[in-house]
């Protein structure tokens, strides 16, 4: 039984109450009694409004279901469909043209373009790795991944392979030639780098001395001018440092004693309290909030054993250089941090309201994470996150402008409660629900003084696409879905609306995750498409991926791209509204159907078993072909909703689903054989809470609000914690 403290009209789990009073509040200048009194007032006043917004979702969905049932199997008459959507309040009138007026935005968001990490804030080690991923070794990123082929003797092996090393160095020199070309010759022929009269001089192997073709690309250096240990360059706002050390194992054999190229990598990181964590009660929420506090104060540490030695990870300090003009230059050593709160749907037993109901978790997140961020705003921590006095909060899974307006109002209430200037709290709007996509301009307008990013998310957005139009017919397979007309239009529309609303130079226009952390060669080839599409940030699955993706922003000046795109015709709303149902379900072979069932069932089970049994909300889960995929609740939503849809429309039977689930459970068990903490699902399926959760996500998928997986996951995780004593 949870021990609780009664404060006014709320009952707070004692461990959360103690954490806030004894750890979060000291140093903020806020009085604990006043904080809880304001907290009580805000949540008890706004919780009913929160519930009303959720009821409106249900009412709209019921009307959609009825209309879709009546039009099943018919070709959509787009004029009729849009009139219906307007009639039920799904599609609202677009506001007149406007530009966002967000102020005090850090340059990493407003005027720079580069990779973004998303990490579970409950994992301190991951959080620290991400915070420190502002800078990364290009040599390590290339050597340790498939970005460099293992062909022709370039295998990774156990020790250092000089053949592979040579390929890494060649790749890096090519990057230097592209990002910092010399007036004559190539970086491959460099014999010495030095500073002469505030400019970079490069002595070549043939004795010639040259410099940069564009001298403004030289920013600063470390060490002595005539023998620098580091040369700092910049391309399209992204810094990179040629590191020189003749005594280093790599540097000693290099023509110019270059040991590495250090890349400015993850400009921003989202510390996630949402889709990548499993936080179902006060114990879990305290872990999340405590790590966020450590990040805001700069004192988060994590000790762990590696190779038989204890190591302690901490946040990196800033980087200091001598500038080209001789003055001291300091660059941030850490990624700029956002925090992602949960959306409007879930409640949490950590706090009970005056009517005994659980608190809307998003209200709790907003109040507590903002309180904690005061440590950064006051500048009394070890490091500064925002140099502009802002707090960056990502708000996911909002449906339409009314819900964004509610967030905007709530943030204002939080600012007043904490004594913060208006619009200190900035908002990142995830464009991952269909009603937000089609009303994106109105959504941005509802928070036009706070918006610092919009971001597309293919997986959640597809999950909502399926659930919204569940009754219309069976949906196409997950693979072809990525090429469907609506997705391309959705991705373009997000950029078009963002540019119309004046986000360029003020806020981020973001793109989604590369979900295959082991396939970096593929990422290097494909993900340049994101900056080319006008996105000034895009999600990557690891610090290594951030370093490699950073090279794309050297090749593409995103702000130039945005200027060009600002004049193109906006993407078609009709395309976005085109529902990707199958034209001819009978064309699917039995083999096609089973393959899709196997693939989705395996992904569902592989993710759910770790979520339920171990409380792991984000992990690299091997797919059916043993390719490691980064999975979070978004991937689970699309997989479960697709199977729900196929079952509902008779593409497959419940018996088929169960047979597939049981067979795939054995596959997942085998894939996890090396994990000592793992609990097998097969063959005692009735005893496996995780297996039951996975099955329910499919069999009860139509009943889940918007196809979200959280209600079932939370319920089953709480069961597992009770059963296993976690």
Curated annotation (Swiss-Prot):
Enzyme class: transferase
GO terms assigned for molecular function: magnesium ion binding; malate synthase activity
Binding locations of acetyl-CoA: 118, 125-126, 276, 313, 541
Primary localization class, coarse: cytoplasm
CDD domains (alphabetical): malate_synt_G
GO BP term (any one): glyoxylate catabolic process
Source species, domain of life: Bacteria
Keywords noted in UniProt: Cytoplasm, Glyoxylate bypass, Magnesium, Metal-binding, Oxidation, Transferase, Tricarboxylic acid cycle
Catalysed transformations (reactions): glyoxylate + acetyl-CoA + H2O = (S)-malate + CoA + H(+)
Pathway it works in: Carbohydrate metabolism; glyoxylate cycle; (S)-malate from isocitrate: step 2/2
Modification sites for Cysteine sulfenic acid (-SOH): 618
Function, as annotated: Involved in the glycolate utilization. Catalyzes the condensation and subsequent hydrolysis of acetyl-coenzyme A (acetyl-CoA) and glyoxylate to form malate and CoA.
NCBIfam families: malate_syn_G (TIGR01345), PRK02999.1 (NF002825)
Protein name stated in the entry: Malate synthase G
Organism field: Marinobacter nauticus (strain ATCC 700491 / DSM 11845 / VT8) (Marinobacter aquaeolei)
Organism lineage string: Bacteria, Pseudomonadati, Pseudomonadota, Gammaproteobacteria, Pseudomonadales
Gene: glcB
């Amino acid at each position: 039984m949870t021990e609780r403290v009664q404060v006014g009209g709320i009952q707070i789990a004692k461990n959360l109450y103690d954490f806030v009073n004894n750890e979060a509040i000291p140093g903020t200048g806020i009085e604990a009694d006043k904080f809880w009194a304001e907290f009580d007032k805000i949540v008890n006043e706004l919780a009913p409004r929160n519930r009303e917004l959720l009821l409106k979702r249900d009412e709209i969905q019921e009307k959609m279901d009825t209309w879709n049932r009546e039009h099943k199997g018919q070709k959509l008459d787009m004029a009729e469909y849009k009139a219906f959507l307007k009639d039920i309040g799904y599609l609202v009138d677009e506001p007149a043209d406007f530009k966002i007026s967000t102020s005090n935005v850090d340059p990493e968001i407003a005027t720079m373009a580069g990779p973004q990490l998303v990490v579970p804030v409950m994992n301190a080690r991951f959080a620290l790795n991400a915070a420190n991923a502002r800078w990364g070794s290009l040599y390590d990123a290339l050597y340790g991944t498939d970005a460099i082929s293992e062909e022709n003797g370039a295998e990774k092996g156990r020790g250092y392979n000089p053949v592979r090393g040579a390929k890494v160095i060649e790749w890096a020199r090519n990057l230097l030639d592209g990002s910092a070309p010399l007036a004559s010759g190539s970086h491959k022929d460099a014999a010495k780098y030095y500073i002469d009269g505030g400019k970079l001089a490069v002595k070549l192997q043939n004795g010639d001395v040259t410099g940069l073709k564009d001298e403004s690309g030289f920013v600063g250096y470390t060490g002595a001018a005539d023998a620098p240990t580091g040369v700092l360059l910049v391309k399209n706002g992204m810094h990179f440092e040629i590191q020189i050390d003749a005594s280093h194992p790599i540097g000693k054999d290099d023509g110019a004693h270059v040991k590495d190229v250090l890349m400015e990598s993850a400009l921003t990181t989202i510390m996630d309290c949402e889709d990548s964590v499993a936080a179902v009660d006060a114990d879990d929420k305290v872990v999340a909030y405590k790590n966020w506090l450590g990040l805001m104060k700069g004192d988060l540490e994590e000790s762990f054993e590696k190779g038989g030695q204890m190591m302690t990870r901490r946040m990196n300090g800033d980087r200091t250089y001598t500038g080209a003009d001789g003055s001291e230059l300091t660059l941030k050593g850490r990624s700029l941090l956002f925090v992602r709160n949960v959306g409007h749907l879930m409640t949490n037993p950590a706090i009970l309201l005056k009517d005994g109901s659980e608190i809307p978790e998003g209200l709790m997140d907003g109040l507590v994470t903002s309180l904690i961020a005061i440590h950064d705003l006051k500048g009394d921590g070890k490091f500064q996150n925002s140099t502009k006095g802002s707090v960056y909060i990502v708000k996911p899974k909002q449906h339409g402008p009314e819900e964004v307006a509610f967030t905007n109002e709530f943030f204002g209430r939080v600012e007043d409660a904490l004594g913060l200037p208006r619009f200190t709290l900035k908002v990142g709007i995830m464009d991952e629900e269909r009603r937000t996509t089609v009303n994106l301009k109105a959504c941005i307008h509802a928070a036009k003084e706070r918006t610092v990013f919009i971001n597309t998310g293919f997986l959640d957005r597809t999950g909502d696409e399926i659930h919204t139009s569940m009754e219309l017919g069976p949906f196409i397979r997950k693979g072809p879905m990525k090429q469907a007309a609506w997705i391309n239009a959705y991705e373009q529309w997000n950029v078009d609306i963002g540019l119309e609303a004046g986000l360029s130079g003020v806020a981020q226009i973001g793109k989604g995750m590369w979900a295959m952390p082991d396939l970096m060669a593929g990422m290097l080839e494909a993900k340049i498409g994101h900056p080319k599409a006008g996105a000034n940030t895009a999600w990557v699955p690891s610090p290594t991926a951030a370093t490699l993706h950073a090279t794309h922003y050297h090749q593409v000046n995103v702000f130039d791209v945005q200027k060009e795109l600002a004049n193109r015709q906006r993407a078609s709303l009709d395309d976005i509204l085109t529902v990707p149902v199958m034209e001819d379900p009978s064309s699917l072979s039995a083999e096609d159907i089973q393959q899709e069932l196997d693939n989705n069932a395996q992904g569902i089970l592989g993710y759910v078993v770790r979520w339920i049994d171990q409380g792991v909300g984000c992990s690299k889960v091997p797919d059916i072909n043993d390719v490691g995929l980064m999975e979070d609740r978004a991937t689970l939503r699309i997989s479960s909703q697709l199977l729900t849809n196929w079952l509902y429309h008779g593409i497959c039977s419940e018996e088929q689903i169960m047979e597939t689930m049981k067979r795939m459970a054995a596959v997942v068990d085998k894939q996890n054989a090396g994990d000592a903490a793992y609990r097998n699902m097969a063959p005692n399926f009735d005893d496996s809470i995780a297996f039951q959760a996975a099955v329910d996500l499919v069999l009860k998928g139509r009943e889940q609000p918007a196809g979200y997986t959280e209600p079932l996951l939370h319920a089953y995780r709480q069961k597992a914690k009770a059963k296993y004593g976690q």
